[in-house]
Amino acid sequence: MRLTWEVETILSTNAEDVALSRLPSTTCTGEQFIARTIEQVWAKAKPELWFIYFKRDACGATIKRDDYGKSTEFGWEIDHIVPVSKGGTDELENLQPLHWENNRHKGEDFPDWTCKKRR
């Protein structure tokens, strides 16, 4: 299930403008990530002891596999470590799972950003 957002379409070749018009957890071009990429990014999360469906993001926040793309207690998104607006790519090395609140809080901040939600 996809989050519903109203986004103003920006027709520009400027990378920063394109990045700002993207929905959270989308590719550099604003497309949804394919299932294989979602699974590969999920595999990068830190295991949660005793639970196979829950893991932890880079901030230590608990995320749930089935809550991908949801704004729930354990919802998560795919984050571009180096933001698209700063030259980040869709390469797996530049992607990480983040609790949706941490991803929104991080925004375009890089390299200095802080976690909003922890354990």
Predicted segments, located by residue:
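Short cysteine-rich loop/turn motifs with clustered Cys
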Residues: 31-76, 99
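Histidine-centered nuclease catalytic patch
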Residues: 61-98, 106-111, 117
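Catalytic cores of phosphodiester-bond-cleaving enzymes
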Residues: 13-21, 40, 46, 103-119
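Short, intrinsically disordered low-complexity segments
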Residues: 1, 21, 55, 64, ...
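Mixed-charge, low-complexity interaction segments
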Residues: 2-17, 22, 42-47, 51, ...
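Short, compositionally biased leader-like segments
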Residues: 20-31
